[in-house]
């Protein structure tokens, strides 16, 4: 069996946007991992919001915006209410202008639309406000198209990423963002460059994304996030050196006390993990004709170095141990690889789910012609995971077909609350599949919309029953329905991916058994037999040599916490060569 070689594009997962699929291709759900949460709104602190009313090109080659003429008396009265910050009354009056009740011209209707969105923002109906600002951002001819960019940035501090404000920021260009490059609004300028970079990244415009991320200054609270996306953008264009440099800048900034970071230890570990994955990906080259892998030992060693920097208390530590096991395997360091797997399968981590670790263990035994041991590992693997796979698929069958996203979302909430009627053998697997940060942000978005709906229902009855009140209620209902559908769809894809990967690992186990049978009959493919380890080689690669800081202590069947991560297993080759 030829081991699957992961590349950085496959394994780096920073809870990032899923790049948009190429034309004719379906989008693939992004894995869950660890992008930093949406920043909290900043306090005023003397910052000035400059309203930029002067005209400029919109960058889209569109015709000039409409011009507002003389306001009707009703529109002027609505604007006065707005200026007096009587947001409730202003919203109702402005909505009448927008709907044409007052007979105002298109230009004044657009002005009223803009002021209506601001009024709703001030009333803390952020989703309803965003719905209107979205309409404005979609129309470069709108008289307040440019000014809306400021409010999109404000909304991004109130609504989480699943609201997809980044998509609306993507309607703007460098020149329009550059208008905020002044002493009073530089924080906004950095934030908008980060958001526009995210838009370019999701649309696979990686070089453009990198250029925009590099405009985010070290003083910005978005700096660390911008550097993460700089790194993974370089990974996407297969430039490992600048990718690693971006991740190193994150660690340097954290060491220097950069602002705007809530969980420094987690981000430091994530940066180490990302560097390890990048080095590992670039260390292995596979010949397209022979499918034989060649390894750059320097880069592979660098990958191991950064995996070892992930703290044992980190949520990423087990991931680092498992991924490092493949690197040790590629380097021929089987004692290290098997030792890591021994840690992963210890009783200290009863809820961990690394079925591929058993596959790797069997591959190592097979490579050393220990066919009986390899067969035993595969048999134990099948005995444990085949029933789990069957149960996972049984649940999945209940959510096949159309319009199953909302029912699965309800199932997701039940599981997170400790319910869901799950067998205890699969509960931790399902919980892990449905607990990544991107999915949790979608759940938080639904909760936020429900909280906004509660605020709306506590608003004055006159507002609720007004035409704008009905629009606010409708906007919240639509947004919640879409958010639930999106969260359910994402959860389904996470669950399906776990099932698909487990099926793949079970098939890999069967392939190993086939190769074992062929080897025992001396019919093994030459490519596979050339990859096996001779007895002489096993004396080099299969023994355990402690350094001056460590001693060998035989394992007696009892695990100790302080030994986790330090296990080694002697491997003796049974190959005849």
What annotation goes with each model-predicted range?
Residues 87, 126, 162, 206, ...:
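TPR-repeat structural position
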Residues 76, 115, 151, 188-195, ...:
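"A position-specific structural signal for the A-helix of alpha-solenoid helical repeats
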């Amino acid at each position: 069996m030829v081991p699957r070689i992961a590349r950085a594009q496959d394994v780096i997962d920073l809870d990032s946007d899923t790049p948009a699929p190429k034309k004719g291709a379906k989008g693939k759900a992004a894995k869950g991992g660890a992008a930093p949460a949406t920043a909290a709104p900043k306090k005023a602190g003397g910052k000035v919001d400059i309203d930029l009313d002067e005209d400029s090109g919109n960058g889209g080659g569109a015709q000039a915006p409409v011009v507002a003429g003389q306001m009707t008396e009703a529109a002027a009265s609505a604007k006065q209410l707005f200026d007096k910050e009587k947001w409730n009354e202003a919203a109702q009056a402005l909505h009448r202008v927008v709907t044409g009740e007052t007979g105002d011209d298109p230009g004044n209707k657009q002005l009223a639309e803009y002021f209506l969105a601001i009024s709703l923002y001030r009333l803390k109906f952020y989703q309803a406000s965003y719905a209107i600002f979205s309409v404005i951002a979609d129309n470069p001819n709108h008289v307040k198209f440019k000014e809306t960019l400021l409010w999109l940035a404000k909304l991004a501090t109130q609504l989480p990423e699943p609201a997809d404000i980044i998509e609306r920021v993507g309607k703007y260009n460098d020149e329009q963002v550059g208008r905020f490059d002044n002493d009073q609004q530089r924080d906004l300028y950095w934030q908008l460059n980060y958001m526009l970079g995210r838009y370019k990244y999701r649309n696979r415009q990686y070089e453009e994304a990198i250029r925009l991320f590099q405009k985010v200054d070290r003083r910005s609270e978005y700096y660390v996030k911008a550097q993460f996306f700089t790194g993974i953008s370089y990974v996407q264009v297969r430039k490992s050196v600048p990718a690693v440099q971006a991740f190193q800048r994150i660690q340097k900034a954290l060491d220097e006390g950069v602002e705007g970071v809530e969980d420094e230890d987690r981000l430091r570990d994530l940066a180490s993990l990302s560097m390890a994955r990048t080095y590992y990906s670039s260390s292995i080259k596979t010949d397209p004709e022979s499918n034989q892998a060649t390894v750059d030992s320097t880069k592979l060693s660098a990958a191991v170095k950064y995996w070892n920097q992930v703290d044992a208390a980190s949520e990423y530590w087990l991931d680092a141990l498992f991924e490092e096991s493949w690197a040790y395997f590629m380097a021929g360091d089987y004692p290290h690889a098997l030792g890591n797997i021994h840690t992963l399968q210890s009783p200290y981590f009863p809820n961990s789910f690394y079925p591929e670790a058993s596959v790797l263990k069997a591959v190592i035994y097979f490579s050393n012609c220990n066919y009986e041991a390899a067969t035993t590992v595969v048999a134990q693997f099948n005995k444990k995971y085949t029933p789990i796979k069957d149960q996972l698929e049984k649940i999945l069958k209940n959510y096949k077909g159309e319009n199953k996203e909302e029912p699965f979302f309800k199932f997701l909430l039940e599981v997170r609350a400790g319910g869901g009627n799950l067998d205890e053998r699969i509960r931790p697997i399902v919980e892990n599949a449905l607990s990544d940060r991107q999915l949790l942000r979608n759940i938080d978005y639904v909760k936020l919309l429900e909280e906004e709906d509660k605020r709306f229902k506590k608003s004055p009855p006159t507002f609720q029953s007004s035409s704008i009140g009905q629009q606010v209620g409708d906007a919240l209902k639509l947004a919640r329905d879409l958010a639930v559908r999106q969260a359910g769809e994402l959860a389904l894809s996470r669950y399906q991916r776990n099932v698909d990967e487990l099926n793949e690992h079970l098939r890999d186990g069967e392939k190993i058994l086939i190769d074992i049978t062929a080897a025992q009959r001396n019919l093994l493919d030459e490519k596979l037999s050339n990859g096996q380890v001779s007895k002489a080689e096993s004396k080099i690669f299969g023994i355990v040599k402690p350094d001056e800081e460590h001693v060998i202590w035989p394992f007696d069947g009892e695990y100790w916490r302080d030994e986790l991560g330090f296990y080694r297993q002697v491997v003796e080759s049974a190959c005849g060569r």
